[in-house]
UniProtKB/Swiss-Prot annotation:
It is found in: Nucleus. GO terms for molecular function: sequence-specific DNA binding; zinc ion binding. Keywords: Activator, DNA-binding, Metal-binding, Nucleus, Transcription, Transcription regulation, Zinc, Zinc-finger. GO terms for cellular component: nucleus. Signal peptide: none annotated. Residues 256-330, 434-457 are annotated as: Disordered. Residues 434-447 have a biased composition (Basic residues). This is Cutinase gene palindrome-binding protein. SMART domains: PAS (SM00091), ZnF_GATA (SM00401). The keyword Ribonucleoprotein does not apply. Residues 295-317 have a biased composition (Basic and acidic residues).
Amino acid sequence: MTGGQMGADGQDSTDIMALLDNNMLGSMGDVSMGLDAVDESSMTGSFGGSNAQTSTEESVARAENQFNTAANNVPGAGPLPAGPFAQMNLTSAASTLTEFTKRRNWPAKVVEELRDFLQILDANGRIKYASPSILNVTGYSVEEIQDIFLKDLIHPDDRGVFVAELNESIASGNPLRLFYRFKKKDGKFAIFETVGHAHIAGSKFAPNPNNQSPFCQAVFMMARPYPTKNAGLLDSFLEHKIENERLKRRIAELRREEEAENDEAQKQWMQSQEGRSDVTPSEGTGVSSNFFRPSTDRGLTDADRAALNKSLTRENLEGAAGSRPDSLNDKMARYEGASHTETIEMLTGLRYIEGERSRGITTGNASPTLIKGDAGIAIPLERDPRTGDKKKKLKTSEEYVCTDCGTLDSPEWRKGPSGPKTLCNACGLRWAKKEKKRNSSVNHHHAPGPAIDHSMA
């Protein structure tokens, strides 16, 4: 039964197969009941060309309206489910792509939508074509940049590298990839990442018929600003990871140092306890018995105890505090304080802490090196002509602590019950008045009474 008969009778083949008995179908076990593959062209011819064209247009319309809410706002609309319908969906998408490529001047439309700017150079490096996206990236229009040598728009320090890479790519045919600083229309330089290749034409396209060797017809280059947003995020992520790893190692080192110092302090304390086992309490206390010893005396070393036995001056107190082992917080505080200079060294590559460029020490060369020691400056041997005169000794002023009020600032230090210069001016005067009054009262109490003249009586 042909397709034409099917259309004329208006019956489907399934209706005729339903009239057949199962026994009749069983007797045809060895006979193939499958349908052979039919040529698409013959099927199109049998059903008519207008119907096939209509079905193709409908499939393209369905593929284009797949994500259109207005077209999908009908019963049964929307994306096709998975299964056999998915293959039909892929077929329609492929047909849509084919329809796009069949459009007129579609490569130019693709180039217009590029965010990176495309440039075509001749063999001499002159710009023959630039994509419209160059206006957003560099500020130049296509007409302003056409027929200009690209090297004239590159930073002078990068021109040599660009010319060498361009000539090497033209000579060898290898693709080129380089970074250079491009001068924008506002006069500022921006870093660009460029990839490209030279188009080597055949000998039959040579302008000179006498020269039948292949030649470079054009150089295609694609440039974009560097770094991109994703590259910048990746660089910052790597910098944070490196900084985190460095801080972890530093913390581990400080913890090991603190544990070693604690062990050493414990050993010294044990040795001091063993050495003081044969000392009487009166000999061991001495002057320090006047001070209150807290319960944490075990953490003090011999240097701390010796510092407490000295006179209460600011220098001695600071020395006692400095002789104690630093805690982890103190070490981290010092480390955090020096991180600023370390950041400068990491960003600039200079030995900032040692004085390079920070204190005016520079040689002025392209690759300066830090000069240590004698820098070649003439220094006279005799700076002071009065070298024979005796130099006056600088009087080092010691700062005292008042044992009564605890002040450190006083215009004058006076004698107290603990010795000279142990009281401030006010406390010393007050104590002197008390002593004077006490002495006068004692003297008045022990003074002899008035003599009575018995002769007068």
